[in-house]
């Protein structure tokens, strides 16, 4: 009798637990969602995540709280998301570096298959950007200076191994010049550094240098895309200048692996609308 009673009690608890989980999933979301961003505030990833996340919050009817966890080309933030509960209340902005961090040695078992992908959000080409008062009017001017001053050009990036590091290194190799790579925890600190004259060039996206270009403090010498930008149509592509290089960042949103299908569907809808808005 005691064994039968224990079995009945255990079975009842299991049923209640499963029912509670089903009810919670059916009411998803009913509390704030934490969105982890792999870069410092102010850069492309941060701006994209906050813009899309804010729209998604309105659609979902719950707050979306943003937390920046920069470091190790995004591995710090992405590892945190991967190890979080797969309940939909912790998600992350994942950048192109997600496909690179294992090869770079920043993390193990961290790649696109580690997550349930919610949606893609953006693609942004790199640029070759310098200060407007640098004296470099064209990319040819910059290359000539670099060849006359090997190793002296300070090129800021969003972290060693990041997509903007790859952009700067690819251009330098193709141009046959030696530069000094200076890593930062995101593109925003790198842009702040070039504005403060602590570095000389940044190979980041147009969005990240737009305010500096519009204020007349920065100048874009080239874009690393197949076609010229609609925002700066007078700026040539690297291909036009003889360099067969295109580098672009992409990003999106992801959740820990194993998210319930109905929860994932809610997030896909809300964040998909956020991207389209």
Enumerate the language-model features and the residues they cover.
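Bacterial N-terminal signal peptides that target proteins for export
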Residues: 1-9
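Bacterial N-terminal signal peptides
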Residues: 9-19
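N-terminal (or domain-start) structured segment
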Residues: 24-114, 152, 176-203, 212
């Amino acid at each position: 009798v005691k064994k039968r009673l224990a079995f009945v009690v255990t079975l009842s608890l299991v049923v209640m637990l499963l029912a509670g989980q089903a009810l919670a999933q059916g009411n998803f979301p009913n509390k704030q969602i934490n969105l982890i961003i792999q870069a410092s505030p102010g850069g492309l990833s941060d701006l994209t995540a906050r813009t899309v996340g804010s729209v998604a919050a309105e659609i979902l009817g719950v707050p979306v709280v943003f937390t920046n966890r920069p470091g190790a080309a995004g591995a710090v933030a992405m590892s945190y998301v991967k190890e979080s509960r797969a309940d939909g209340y912790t998600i992350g902005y994942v950048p192109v570096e997600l496909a690179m961090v294992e090869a770079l040695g920043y993390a193990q078992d961290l790649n696109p298959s580690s997550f349930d992908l919610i949606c893609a959000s953006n693609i942004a080409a790199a640029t070759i950007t310098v200060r407007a008062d640098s004296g470099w009017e064209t990319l040819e001017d910059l290359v000539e200076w670099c060849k006359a001053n090997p190793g002296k050009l300070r090129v800021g990036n969003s972290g060693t191994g990041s997509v903007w590091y790859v952009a700067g290194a690819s251009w330098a190799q193709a141009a046959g010049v030696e530069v000094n790579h200076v890593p930062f925890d995101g593109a925003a600190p790198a842009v702040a550094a070039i504005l403060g004259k602590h570095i000389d060039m940044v190979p980041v996206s147009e969005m990240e240098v737009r305010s500096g270009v519009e204020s007349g403090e920065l100048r874009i010498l080239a874009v690393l895309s197949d076609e010229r930008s609609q925002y700066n149509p007078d700026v040539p592509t690297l291909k036009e200048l003889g360099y067969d290089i295109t580098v672009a960042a992409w990003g999106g949103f992801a959740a820990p692996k194993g998210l319930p299908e109905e929860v994932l569907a809610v997030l896909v809808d809300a964040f998909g609308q956020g991207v389209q808005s």
